[in-house]
Protein backbone atom coordinates (compact mmCIF):
# COMPACT_ATOMS: atom_id res chain seq x y z
CA UNK A 1 0.00 0.00 0.00
CA UNK A 2 1.33 3.42 -0.92
CA UNK A 3 2.20 5.89 1.82
CA UNK A 4 0.54 9.29 2.17
CA UNK A 5 -2.51 8.47 0.07
CA UNK A 6 -5.33 8.74 2.63
CA UNK A 7 -6.93 12.15 3.12
CA UNK A 8 -9.63 14.06 4.99
CA UNK A 9 -10.88 17.41 3.80
CA UNK A 10 -13.78 19.29 2.29
CA UNK A 11 -15.00 20.52 -1.06
CA UNK A 12 -13.61 23.93 -1.98
CA UNK A 13 -15.92 26.88 -1.24
CA UNK A 14 -18.29 24.77 0.89
CA UNK A 15 -17.46 24.99 4.61
CA UNK A 16 -20.20 22.46 5.50
CA UNK A 17 -18.87 19.77 3.17
CA UNK A 18 -16.72 16.80 4.24
CA UNK A 19 -14.56 14.32 2.34
CA UNK A 20 -12.75 11.06 3.08
CA UNK A 21 -10.65 9.95 0.12
CA UNK A 22 -8.03 7.32 -0.73
CA UNK A 23 -5.72 8.23 -3.61
CA UNK A 24 -3.67 5.02 -3.46
CA UNK A 25 -4.87 3.59 -6.79
CA UNK A 26 -7.03 6.27 -8.29
CA UNK A 27 -9.56 8.15 -6.16
CA UNK A 28 -11.88 6.15 -3.93
CA UNK A 29 -14.05 7.41 -1.11
CA UNK A 30 -16.97 9.69 -0.42
CA UNK A 31 -17.78 13.34 0.08
CA UNK A 32 -20.79 15.23 1.36
CA UNK A 33 -21.85 18.30 -0.61
CA UNK A 34 -24.93 20.45 0.03
CA UNK A 35 -26.45 17.74 2.22
CA UNK A 36 -26.01 14.94 -0.35
CA UNK A 37 -23.55 12.04 0.00
CA UNK A 38 -21.57 11.11 -3.12
CA UNK A 39 -19.14 8.29 -3.86
CA UNK A 40 -16.18 8.31 -6.19
CA UNK A 41 -14.23 5.29 -7.43
CA UNK A 42 -12.12 4.32 -10.47
CA UNK A 43 -13.89 2.69 -13.39
CA UNK A 44 -12.57 -0.80 -14.08
CA UNK A 45 -11.45 0.01 -17.63
CA UNK A 46 -7.92 -0.99 -18.72
CA UNK A 47 -5.50 1.90 -19.27
CA UNK A 48 -8.12 4.44 -18.25
CA UNK A 49 -8.09 7.09 -15.53
CA UNK A 50 -11.85 7.57 -15.69
CA UNK A 51 -13.81 7.65 -12.42
CA UNK A 52 -17.47 7.26 -11.51
CA UNK A 53 -19.21 9.73 -9.19
CA UNK A 54 -22.68 8.82 -7.95
CA UNK A 55 -25.11 9.55 -5.12
CA UNK A 56 -25.56 7.16 -2.23
CA UNK A 57 -29.26 6.82 -3.04
CA UNK A 58 -28.36 5.27 -6.41
CA UNK A 59 -26.56 2.32 -4.80
CA UNK A 60 -28.38 -0.94 -5.26
CA UNK A 61 -29.65 -2.08 -1.86
CA UNK A 62 -27.99 -5.25 -0.65
CA UNK A 63 -31.14 -6.45 1.10
CA UNK A 64 -34.26 -4.93 2.64
CA UNK A 65 -34.04 -6.48 6.11
CA UNK A 66 -33.73 -3.83 8.86
CA UNK A 67 -30.44 -4.12 10.69
CA UNK A 68 -29.71 -3.16 14.27
CA UNK A 69 -27.02 -2.74 16.90
CA UNK A 70 -26.95 -5.52 19.48
CA UNK A 71 -26.47 -3.20 22.48
CA UNK A 72 -29.64 -3.09 24.59
CA UNK A 73 -28.65 -0.84 27.50
CA UNK A 74 -31.00 2.17 27.54
CA UNK A 75 -30.01 4.15 30.63
CA UNK A 76 -26.79 5.88 31.58
CA UNK A 77 -25.54 4.91 35.00
CA UNK A 78 -26.39 7.25 37.86
CA UNK A 79 -25.02 10.76 37.48
CA UNK A 80 -24.64 11.09 41.26
CA UNK A 81 -20.91 10.23 41.40
CA UNK A 82 -20.27 13.00 38.86
CA UNK A 83 -22.54 15.70 40.24
CA UNK A 84 -21.72 15.25 43.91
CA UNK A 85 -17.99 14.66 43.78
CA UNK A 86 -17.03 16.96 40.93
CA UNK A 87 -19.78 19.58 40.93
CA UNK A 88 -19.41 19.92 37.18
CA UNK A 89 -21.98 20.86 34.57
CA UNK A 90 -21.93 18.92 31.31
CA UNK A 91 -20.55 21.27 28.62
CA UNK A 92 -22.68 22.05 25.57
CA UNK A 93 -22.73 20.11 22.32
CA UNK A 94 -19.87 21.24 20.10
CA UNK A 95 -17.35 21.90 22.88
CA UNK A 96 -13.64 21.29 22.27
CA UNK A 97 -12.55 18.06 23.95
CA UNK A 98 -8.99 17.31 24.98
CA UNK A 99 -7.22 15.11 22.41
CA UNK A 100 -7.60 11.35 22.94
CA UNK A 101 -5.99 8.42 21.15
CA UNK A 102 -7.45 4.91 20.82
CA UNK A 103 -4.87 2.27 19.88
CA UNK A 104 -6.89 -0.34 17.99
CA UNK A 105 -6.18 -3.93 17.00
CA UNK A 106 -8.50 -5.55 14.44
CA UNK A 107 -8.82 -9.33 14.48
CA UNK A 108 -9.99 -10.81 11.17
CA UNK A 109 -11.66 -14.15 11.77
CA UNK A 110 -11.48 -17.21 9.50
CA UNK A 111 -14.82 -16.50 7.82
CA UNK A 112 -13.50 -13.09 6.74
CA UNK A 113 -10.25 -14.54 5.42
CA UNK A 114 -12.32 -17.02 3.40
CA UNK A 115 -14.65 -14.27 2.12
CA UNK A 116 -11.66 -12.41 0.70
CA UNK A 117 -10.19 -15.62 -0.79
CA UNK A 118 -7.13 -15.39 1.48
CA UNK A 119 -6.17 -12.05 -0.13
CA UNK A 120 -4.84 -10.44 3.06
CA UNK A 121 -3.63 -7.36 1.16
CA UNK A 122 -7.20 -6.67 0.03
CA UNK A 123 -8.43 -7.01 3.62
CA UNK A 124 -5.76 -4.59 4.86
CA UNK A 125 -6.63 -2.02 2.19
CA UNK A 126 -10.33 -2.21 3.06
CA UNK A 127 -9.55 -1.78 6.77
CA UNK A 128 -7.35 1.26 6.06
CA UNK A 129 -10.15 2.89 4.05
CA UNK A 130 -12.73 2.21 6.76
CA UNK A 131 -10.46 3.60 9.44
CA UNK A 132 -9.86 6.75 7.41
CA UNK A 133 -13.62 7.41 7.50
CA UNK A 134 -13.90 6.49 11.20
CA UNK A 135 -11.29 9.14 12.00
CA UNK A 136 -13.19 11.68 9.94
CA UNK A 137 -16.32 10.90 12.00
CA UNK A 138 -14.44 11.27 15.30
CA UNK A 139 -12.69 14.55 14.41
CA UNK A 140 -15.33 16.73 16.18
CA UNK A 141 -14.75 14.75 19.40
CA UNK A 142 -10.97 15.24 19.00
CA UNK A 143 -10.42 11.47 19.05
CA UNK A 144 -7.91 9.73 16.80
CA UNK A 145 -8.15 5.97 16.26
CA UNK A 146 -4.69 4.56 15.53
CA UNK A 147 -4.48 1.07 14.05
CA UNK A 148 -1.61 -0.69 15.84
CA UNK A 149 -2.16 -4.18 14.49
CA UNK A 150 -4.19 -6.57 12.33
CA UNK A 151 -4.43 -10.21 13.40
CA UNK A 152 -5.55 -12.77 10.81
CA UNK A 153 -7.05 -16.08 11.90
CA UNK A 154 -6.02 -17.63 8.59
CA UNK A 155 -6.16 -21.30 9.57
CA UNK A 156 -8.83 -21.40 12.27
CA UNK A 157 -10.65 -19.22 14.76
CA UNK A 158 -9.05 -19.00 18.20
CA UNK A 159 -12.44 -18.66 19.89
CA UNK A 160 -15.86 -20.09 19.08
CA UNK A 161 -17.41 -17.57 16.64
CA UNK A 162 -21.16 -18.25 16.47
CA UNK A 163 -24.32 -16.45 15.41
CA UNK A 164 -24.89 -15.52 19.06
CA UNK A 165 -23.45 -12.01 19.14
CA UNK A 166 -23.42 -11.79 22.94
CA UNK A 167 -21.69 -15.15 23.41
CA UNK A 168 -19.06 -14.39 20.77
CA UNK A 169 -18.42 -10.95 22.27
CA UNK A 170 -17.89 -12.43 25.74
CA UNK A 171 -15.54 -15.09 24.37
CA UNK A 172 -13.58 -12.49 22.43
CA UNK A 173 -13.31 -10.29 25.53
CA UNK A 174 -11.96 -13.17 27.60
CA UNK A 175 -9.45 -14.06 24.85
CA UNK A 176 -8.30 -10.45 24.61
CA UNK A 177 -7.74 -10.28 28.37
CA UNK A 178 -5.87 -13.58 28.59
CA UNK A 179 -4.00 -13.67 25.27
CA UNK A 180 -4.04 -10.62 23.00
CA UNK A 181 -3.08 -8.08 25.68
CA UNK A 182 0.00 -10.16 26.45
CA UNK A 183 1.06 -10.11 22.78
CA UNK A 184 0.82 -6.36 22.06
CA UNK A 185 -0.21 -3.36 24.10
CA UNK A 186 -3.38 -1.70 22.80
CA UNK A 187 -6.53 0.01 24.08
CA UNK A 188 -9.37 -1.62 22.16
CA UNK A 189 -9.89 -4.67 19.94
CA UNK A 190 -12.41 -5.35 17.19
CA UNK A 191 -13.38 -8.78 15.88
CA UNK A 192 -14.44 -8.63 12.22
CA UNK A 193 -16.54 -11.59 11.06
CA UNK A 194 -18.57 -12.71 8.05
CA UNK A 195 -20.79 -14.87 10.27
CA UNK A 196 -24.43 -13.73 10.31
CA UNK A 197 -25.18 -12.51 13.84
CA UNK A 198 -28.61 -13.15 15.34
CA UNK A 199 -30.38 -12.33 12.09
CA UNK A 200 -30.27 -8.52 12.04
CA UNK A 201 -27.41 -7.65 14.40
CA UNK A 202 -24.62 -5.62 12.80
CA UNK A 203 -22.42 -5.11 15.84
CA UNK A 204 -22.23 -5.33 19.60
CA UNK A 205 -19.94 -4.13 22.37
CA UNK A 206 -19.85 -3.38 26.10
CA UNK A 207 -21.07 0.08 27.10
CA UNK A 208 -18.36 1.92 29.11
CA UNK A 209 -15.94 -0.89 28.17
CA UNK A 210 -13.00 1.17 26.90
CA UNK A 211 -9.69 0.41 28.67
CA UNK A 212 -11.06 -2.62 30.56
CA UNK A 213 -9.10 -5.80 29.89
CA UNK A 214 -11.98 -8.12 28.97
CA UNK A 215 -14.57 -5.50 27.96
CA UNK A 216 -12.71 -3.10 25.64
CA UNK A 217 -13.85 -5.11 22.61
CA UNK A 218 -16.41 -4.96 19.84
CA UNK A 219 -17.82 -7.46 17.37
CA UNK A 220 -18.62 -6.29 13.82
CA UNK A 221 -20.40 -8.24 11.10
CA UNK A 222 -18.94 -7.55 7.65
CA UNK A 223 -22.39 -7.14 6.14
CA UNK A 224 -21.70 -4.60 3.39
CA UNK A 225 -19.27 -4.11 0.51
CA UNK A 226 -19.62 -0.34 0.95
CA UNK A 227 -16.71 1.08 2.97
CA UNK A 228 -18.83 3.98 4.28
CA UNK A 229 -21.42 1.61 5.76
CA UNK A 230 -18.83 -0.46 7.59
CA UNK A 231 -17.02 2.62 8.92
CA UNK A 232 -20.30 3.89 10.35
CA UNK A 233 -20.89 0.61 12.23
CA UNK A 234 -17.33 0.74 13.61
CA UNK A 235 -17.84 4.33 14.79
CA UNK A 236 -21.22 3.46 16.33
CA UNK A 237 -19.97 0.49 18.37
CA UNK A 238 -16.87 2.37 19.50
CA UNK A 239 -19.18 5.14 20.69
CA UNK A 240 -20.84 2.67 23.07
CA UNK A 241 -17.42 1.78 24.52
CA UNK A 242 -16.98 5.51 25.21
CA UNK A 243 -20.21 5.77 27.19
CA UNK A 244 -22.69 6.69 24.44
CA UNK A 245 -26.15 5.10 24.40
CA UNK A 246 -28.66 4.92 21.57
CA UNK A 247 -30.20 8.23 20.63
CA UNK A 248 -33.74 9.08 21.67
CA UNK A 249 -36.17 11.48 19.96
CA UNK A 250 -34.83 14.42 21.98
CA UNK A 251 -31.28 13.99 20.61
CA UNK A 252 -30.31 16.39 17.85
CA UNK A 253 -27.57 16.77 15.25
CA UNK A 254 -27.15 18.72 12.04
CA UNK A 255 -28.69 16.04 9.85
CA UNK A 256 -30.83 13.38 11.55
CA UNK A 257 -30.54 10.51 12.19
CA UNK A 258 -27.27 10.73 14.13
CA UNK A 259 -24.47 8.17 14.59
CA UNK A 260 -25.92 6.52 17.71
CA UNK A 261 -29.38 5.81 16.24
CA UNK A 262 -30.12 2.16 17.06
CA UNK A 263 -31.00 1.03 13.52
CA UNK A 264 -29.10 1.17 10.25
CA UNK A 265 -29.80 4.39 8.35
CA UNK A 266 -29.62 5.12 4.62
CA UNK A 267 -27.38 6.88 3.94
CA UNK A 268 -25.38 6.27 7.12
CA UNK A 269 -25.09 9.30 9.42
CA UNK A 270 -21.77 11.04 10.06
CA UNK A 271 -22.54 13.25 13.07
CA UNK A 272 -22.83 12.54 16.77
CA UNK A 273 -25.87 13.94 18.54
CA UNK A 274 -26.10 16.40 21.41
CA UNK A 275 -26.84 13.40 23.66
CA UNK A 276 -23.68 11.60 22.51
CA UNK A 277 -21.55 14.66 23.27
CA UNK A 278 -23.02 14.89 26.77
CA UNK A 279 -22.69 11.17 27.45
CA UNK A 280 -19.07 11.08 26.24
CA UNK A 281 -18.25 14.03 28.48
CA UNK A 282 -19.85 12.32 31.49
CA UNK A 283 -17.93 9.14 30.67
CA UNK A 284 -14.63 11.04 30.73
CA UNK A 285 -15.50 12.67 34.06
CA UNK A 286 -16.69 9.51 35.77
CA UNK A 287 -14.30 6.86 34.44
CA UNK A 288 -11.18 8.92 33.64
CA UNK A 289 -10.03 6.35 31.03
CA UNK A 290 -6.23 6.49 31.24
CA UNK A 291 -5.45 4.24 28.30
CA UNK A 292 -6.62 6.75 25.68
CA UNK A 293 -4.67 9.77 26.96
CA UNK A 294 -1.24 9.26 25.38
CA UNK A 295 -0.48 9.18 21.64
CA UNK A 296 0.88 5.93 20.19
CA UNK A 297 4.53 5.68 19.26
CA UNK A 298 5.01 6.24 15.54
CA UNK A 299 6.61 2.81 15.09
CA UNK A 300 3.52 1.13 16.56
CA UNK A 301 1.07 2.52 13.98
CA UNK A 302 0.23 -0.19 11.43
CA UNK A 303 -1.74 1.86 8.88
CA UNK A 304 -0.33 4.21 6.21
CA UNK A 305 0.32 7.79 7.30
CA UNK A 306 -2.39 10.40 6.69
CA UNK A 307 -0.76 13.79 6.16
CA UNK A 308 -2.95 16.50 7.66
CA UNK A 309 -4.67 14.48 10.39
CA UNK A 310 -2.63 16.12 13.15
CA UNK A 311 -1.03 12.82 14.22
CA UNK A 312 2.72 12.37 13.73
CA UNK A 313 3.09 9.03 11.95
CA UNK A 314 5.90 6.95 10.49
CA UNK A 315 7.22 8.48 7.27
CA UNK A 316 6.27 12.04 8.31
CA UNK A 317 8.71 14.60 9.65
CA UNK A 318 5.78 16.36 11.35
CA UNK A 319 1.99 16.75 11.11
CA UNK A 320 0.14 19.84 12.30
CA UNK A 321 -3.25 19.19 10.72
CA UNK A 322 -4.69 20.77 7.61
CA UNK A 323 -3.10 23.91 6.10
CA UNK A 324 -6.17 25.87 7.24
CA UNK A 325 -5.85 24.71 10.86
CA UNK A 326 -2.06 24.44 11.31
CA UNK A 327 -0.55 26.85 13.84
CA UNK A 328 2.80 25.07 14.16
CA UNK A 329 5.76 27.29 13.12
CA UNK A 330 8.03 24.27 12.65
CA UNK A 331 5.94 22.26 10.19
CA UNK A 332 4.82 22.66 6.57
CA UNK A 333 1.22 21.43 6.72
CA UNK A 334 0.99 20.77 2.98
CA UNK A 335 3.92 18.32 2.90
CA UNK A 336 4.26 17.19 6.55
CA UNK A 337 7.93 18.13 6.36
CA UNK A 338 9.93 20.33 8.73
CA UNK A 339 10.60 23.91 7.82
CA UNK A 340 14.25 24.93 7.29
CA UNK A 341 16.19 25.03 10.58
CA UNK A 342 13.63 23.02 12.57
CA UNK A 343 14.76 19.84 14.35
CA UNK A 344 11.23 18.74 15.19
CA UNK A 345 7.61 19.76 14.88
CA UNK A 346 5.68 17.31 17.06
CA UNK A 347 6.17 15.40 20.28
CA UNK A 348 6.38 16.12 24.00
CA UNK A 349 10.17 16.38 23.66
CA UNK A 350 9.99 19.17 21.07
CA UNK A 351 10.24 22.76 22.28
CA UNK A 352 10.39 25.71 19.88
CA UNK A 353 11.37 23.41 17.01
CA UNK A 354 14.31 21.95 19.00
CA UNK A 355 14.66 18.53 20.66
CA UNK A 356 14.72 18.81 24.44
CA UNK A 357 17.75 17.75 26.45
CA UNK A 358 18.06 14.20 27.77
CA UNK A 359 16.52 13.78 31.21
CA UNK A 360 13.81 16.41 30.73
CA UNK A 361 10.56 15.08 32.17
CA UNK A 362 8.01 14.73 29.37
CA UNK A 363 5.26 12.80 31.13
CA UNK A 364 4.84 13.06 34.91
CA UNK A 365 3.59 10.16 37.01
CA UNK A 366 -0.18 10.49 37.31
CA UNK A 367 -0.65 8.34 40.41
CA UNK A 368 0.81 5.54 42.53
CA UNK A 369 0.78 3.07 39.64
CA UNK A 370 2.41 5.30 37.05
CA UNK A 371 6.05 6.31 36.56
CA UNK A 372 7.47 9.47 35.01
CA UNK A 373 9.04 9.37 31.53
CA UNK A 374 11.97 11.50 30.37
CA UNK A 375 13.26 12.70 27.00
CA UNK A 376 16.19 10.80 25.51
CA UNK A 377 17.77 13.81 23.81
CA UNK A 378 17.69 11.88 20.51
CA UNK A 379 14.00 11.99 19.65
CA UNK A 380 11.11 14.43 19.90
CA UNK A 381 8.87 11.58 21.05
CA UNK A 382 8.32 10.94 24.74
CA UNK A 383 9.10 7.26 25.44
CA UNK A 384 6.20 4.82 25.75
CA UNK A 385 4.13 5.27 28.89
CA UNK A 386 5.28 2.71 31.44
CA UNK A 387 3.67 1.72 34.73
CA UNK A 388 4.68 0.35 38.10
CA UNK A 389 4.93 -3.44 38.10
CA UNK A 390 1.73 -5.38 38.63
CA UNK A 391 1.41 -6.19 42.33
CA UNK A 392 3.06 -2.99 43.58
CA UNK A 393 1.13 -1.72 46.67
CA UNK A 394 -0.88 1.45 46.03
CA UNK A 395 -3.33 3.85 47.72
CA UNK A 396 -1.73 3.42 51.15
CA UNK A 397 -1.73 -0.38 50.81
CA UNK A 398 -5.45 -0.44 50.00
CA UNK A 399 -4.72 -2.22 46.73
CA UNK A 400 -2.13 -3.44 44.26
CA UNK A 401 -1.23 -1.98 40.87
CA UNK A 402 -2.71 -3.74 37.85
CA UNK A 403 -1.94 -2.57 34.30
CA UNK A 404 -1.41 1.01 35.46
CA UNK A 405 -4.47 1.24 37.72
CA UNK A 406 -5.08 0.64 41.41
CA UNK A 407 -8.38 -1.28 41.44
CA UNK A 408 -10.01 -1.38 44.88
CA UNK A 409 -13.55 -2.41 45.81
CA UNK A 410 -14.37 0.95 47.43
CA UNK A 411 -13.83 2.89 44.21
CA UNK A 412 -15.78 0.28 42.24
CA UNK A 413 -18.75 0.69 44.61
CA UNK A 414 -18.59 4.48 44.28
CA UNK A 415 -18.51 4.21 40.47
CA UNK A 416 -21.49 1.84 40.44
CA UNK A 417 -23.73 3.57 42.97
CA UNK A 418 -22.88 6.87 44.69
CA UNK A 419 -20.04 8.83 46.34
CA UNK A 420 -21.27 7.66 49.74
CA UNK A 421 -21.24 3.95 48.82
CA UNK A 422 -18.83 1.66 50.66
CA UNK A 423 -17.93 -2.03 50.46
CA UNK A 424 -20.55 -4.30 52.04
CA UNK A 425 -19.85 -6.47 55.07
CA UNK A 426 -18.24 -9.86 54.49
CA UNK A 427 -21.50 -11.76 55.00
CA UNK A 428 -22.91 -10.27 51.77
CA UNK A 429 -20.15 -11.88 49.74
CA UNK A 430 -21.22 -15.32 51.02
CA UNK A 431 -24.02 -15.09 48.44
CA UNK A 432 -21.38 -15.87 45.82
CA UNK A 433 -21.30 -19.41 47.24
CA UNK A 434 -24.81 -20.02 45.83
CA UNK A 435 -23.91 -20.33 42.16
CA UNK A 436 -27.14 -18.44 41.47
CA UNK A 437 -28.06 -16.08 38.65
CA UNK A 438 -26.72 -13.17 40.70
CA UNK A 439 -24.15 -14.74 43.03
CA UNK A 440 -21.42 -16.73 41.31
CA UNK A 441 -17.80 -16.65 40.16
CA UNK A 442 -18.03 -18.32 36.76
CA UNK A 443 -20.61 -19.29 34.17
CA UNK A 444 -20.77 -21.24 30.95
CA UNK A 445 -20.95 -19.26 27.71
CA UNK A 446 -24.53 -18.40 26.77
CA UNK A 447 -27.37 -16.55 28.47
CA UNK A 448 -28.69 -19.77 30.02
CA UNK A 449 -25.24 -21.20 30.74
CA UNK A 450 -24.72 -22.87 34.11
CA UNK A 451 -23.47 -20.64 36.96
CA UNK A 452 -20.73 -21.95 39.20
CA UNK A 453 -20.38 -20.91 42.86
CA UNK A 454 -17.19 -19.34 44.13
CA UNK A 455 -14.91 -21.45 46.27
CA UNK A 456 -14.97 -20.22 49.87
CA UNK A 457 -11.63 -18.45 49.50
CA UNK A 458 -12.74 -16.73 46.26
CA UNK A 459 -16.03 -15.11 47.33
CA UNK A 460 -14.57 -11.60 47.00
CA UNK A 461 -13.69 -12.22 43.35
CA UNK A 462 -17.26 -12.84 42.19
CA UNK A 463 -20.18 -10.39 42.40
CA UNK A 464 -19.30 -7.09 44.12
CA UNK A 465 -21.52 -6.17 47.08
CA UNK A 466 -21.77 -2.62 48.36
CA UNK A 467 -23.43 -0.63 51.13
CA UNK A 468 -25.26 2.28 49.50
CA UNK A 469 -25.65 5.08 52.04
CA UNK A 470 -27.17 7.61 49.64
CA UNK A 471 -30.43 9.38 50.51
CA UNK A 472 -33.32 7.02 51.36
CA UNK A 473 -31.45 3.94 50.10
CA UNK A 474 -29.27 2.45 52.85
CA UNK A 475 -29.11 -0.93 51.12
CA UNK A 476 -26.68 -3.25 52.90
CA UNK A 477 -25.93 -5.84 50.19
CA UNK A 478 -26.46 -3.88 47.00
CA UNK A 479 -25.24 -5.37 43.73
CA UNK A 480 -25.23 -4.26 40.12
CA UNK A 481 -26.38 -6.62 37.40
CA UNK A 482 -27.21 -6.39 33.70
CA UNK A 483 -28.99 -9.07 31.68
CA UNK A 484 -27.16 -7.89 28.54
CA UNK A 485 -23.75 -7.89 30.26
CA UNK A 486 -23.49 -10.32 33.13
CA UNK A 487 -19.87 -9.33 33.81
CA UNK A 488 -21.09 -5.91 34.88
CA UNK A 489 -20.82 -5.64 38.66
CA UNK A 490 -18.21 -8.39 38.98
CA UNK A 491 -15.10 -7.51 41.02
CA UNK A 492 -12.50 -6.19 38.58
CA UNK A 493 -9.32 -8.17 37.80
CA UNK A 494 -6.33 -7.20 39.93
CA UNK A 495 -8.50 -6.09 42.87
CA UNK A 496 -7.21 -6.81 46.38
CA UNK A 497 -9.31 -9.60 47.90
CA UNK A 498 -7.19 -10.22 51.03
CA UNK A 499 -3.88 -9.00 52.37
CA UNK A 500 -1.28 -10.19 49.90
CA UNK A 501 -3.88 -11.54 47.46
CA UNK A 502 -5.62 -10.30 44.29
CA UNK A 503 -8.45 -11.41 42.00
CA UNK A 504 -7.20 -13.07 38.82
CA UNK A 505 -9.60 -15.14 36.67
CA UNK A 506 -12.19 -14.88 39.48
CA UNK A 507 -9.83 -16.52 41.97
CA UNK A 508 -8.18 -14.91 45.01
CA UNK A 509 -4.50 -15.72 44.51
CA UNK A 510 -1.13 -14.75 46.00
CA UNK A 511 -0.02 -11.40 44.58
CA UNK A 512 3.56 -12.62 44.35
CA UNK A 513 2.66 -15.41 41.92
CA UNK A 514 -0.34 -13.81 40.16
CA UNK A 515 1.70 -12.08 37.47
Swiss-Prot record:
Annotated Ca(2+) 3 binding sites: 370-371, 385
InterPro entries: ADAM_Cys-rich, Disintegrin_CS, Disintegrin_dom, Disintegrin_dom_sf, MetalloPept_cat_dom_sf, Peptidase_M12B, Reprolysin_adamalysin
SUPFAM superfamilies referenced in this protein's UniProt entry, alphabetically: Blood coagulation inhibitor (disintegrin) (SSF57552), Metalloproteases ('zincins'), catalytic domain (SSF55486)
Tissue: Expressed by the venom gland.
Chain ranges for the short sequence motif D/ECD-tripeptide as given in the UniProt record: 368-370
SMART domains: ACR, DISIN
Residues that bind Zn(2+): 236, 240, 246
Disulphide bridges: 211-291, 251-275, 253-258, 307-336, 318-331, 320-326, 330-353, 344-350, 349-375, 362-382, 369-401, 394-406, 413-466, 428-477, 441-454, 461-503, 497-508
Binding site for Ca(2+) 1: 103, 187, 291
Protein name: Zinc metalloproteinase-disintegrin-like EoMP06
Amino acid sequence: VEDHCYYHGRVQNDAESTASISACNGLKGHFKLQGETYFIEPLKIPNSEAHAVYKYENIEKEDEAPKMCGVTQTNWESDEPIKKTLGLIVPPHGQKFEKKFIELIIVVDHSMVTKYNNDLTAVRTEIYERLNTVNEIYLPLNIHVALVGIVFWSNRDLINVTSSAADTLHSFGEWRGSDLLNQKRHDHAQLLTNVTLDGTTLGITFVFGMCKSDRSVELIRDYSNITFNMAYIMAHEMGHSLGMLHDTKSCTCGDKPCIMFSKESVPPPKEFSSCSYDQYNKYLLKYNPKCIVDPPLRKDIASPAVCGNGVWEEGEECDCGSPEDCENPCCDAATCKLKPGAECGNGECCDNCKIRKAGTECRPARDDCDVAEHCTGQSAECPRNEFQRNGQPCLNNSGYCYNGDCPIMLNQCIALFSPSATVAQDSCFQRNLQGSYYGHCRKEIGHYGKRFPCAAQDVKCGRLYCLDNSFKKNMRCKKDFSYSDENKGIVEPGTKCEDGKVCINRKCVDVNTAY
